[in-house]
Curated annotation (Swiss-Prot):
CC terms in the record's Gene Ontology section: host cell nucleolus; host cell nucleoplasm
Subcellular location: Host nucleus, Host nucleoplasm; Host nucleus, Host nucleolus
The protein, known as: U exon protein
Superkingdom as given in the UniProt entry: Viruses
Ranges annotated as biased composition (Polar residues): 202-217
Family membership: Belongs to the adenoviridae U exon protein family.
Comp. bias regions, Basic residues: 188-197
Region described as Disordered: 79-113, 171-217
Keywords: Host nucleus, Late protein
């Protein structure tokens, strides 16, 4: 691009694209004329200080991230450097001090176990990365589940004072041990006879001890 003064004596050639000149001129509110699609620019007065400022403006723009239509970054934000060269949402999300908030948005979750935000502990207290706190909705107790354990070991803490104890740890038995032992085919008939009070003759109970002696009389 070639910048020429009104008198034609002063001129400056640069490799800066014309679109940056338009942004610079709009910010400075400069009046100019251009020919050949911006290859030549005519100013009323060509000032060396103005050219220096224009080169510095172009250098600042080229060093910052370019505007992205995907993230919605405006050209003014990219030029000024606001938001780290990103849109408002992206800058807030990728800010080094930004903290994500996890937890349920609805107060009622049908009794499901949902993660809730836990208050930050004091700097002196160590944080356990392998433990996550969950709250059971509608039951008023806090359950701590340890990730990586072979079996879930919930520690129930009474939040409403209804259990009468501070904490209780119980280990859930495997599903294979919790099932009742299988009944073989031969034991099924024996159990059936026991339910019928040991009947052997047509479902009637045999007389025992004193009843047999009384019948002999």
């Amino acid at each position: 691009m070639k910048i020429v003064g009104a008198d034609g004596q002063e001129q400056e050639e640069t490799d800066i694209p014309f679109r940056l000149w338009r942004k610079f001129a709009a910010r400075r509110k400069l009046q100019y004329q251009s020919w050949e699609e911006g290859k030549e620019v005519l100013l009323n007065k060509l000032d060396r200080n103005l050219l220096t400022d224009f080169k510095a403006f172009a250098a600042r723009f080229s060093s910052r991230p370019r505007p992205s239509k995907i993230f919605g970054t405006s050209l003014s934000e990219a030029i000024s450097g606001e938001g780290n060269g990103q849109s408002g949402r992206g800058a807030a999300r990728n800010h080094p001090r930004a903290r994500t908030r996890c937890g349920a948005t609805s107060p009622n979750h049908g009794g499901r176990v949902v993660p809730v935000p836990v208050a930050a502990a004091s700097p002196g207290a160590p944080k356990k990365a392998d433990e996550a706190a969950y709250r059971v909705r509608g039951r008023g107790r806090l359950i701590t589940r340890r990730a990586g354990a072979a079996h879930t070991q919930p520690a129930a803490i009474d939040l409403g004072g209804g259990f009468g104890h501070c904490a209780q740890e119980e280990k859930e038995a495997p599903f294979s041990q919790a099932r009742a032992p299988a009944i073989t085919r031969g034991n099924r008939g024996q159990r059936g006879r026991k339910r019928r009070c040991g009947a052997t003759n047509g479902g009637f109970q045999q007389p025992t001890g004193a009843n047999q002696a009384w019948q002999r009389r």
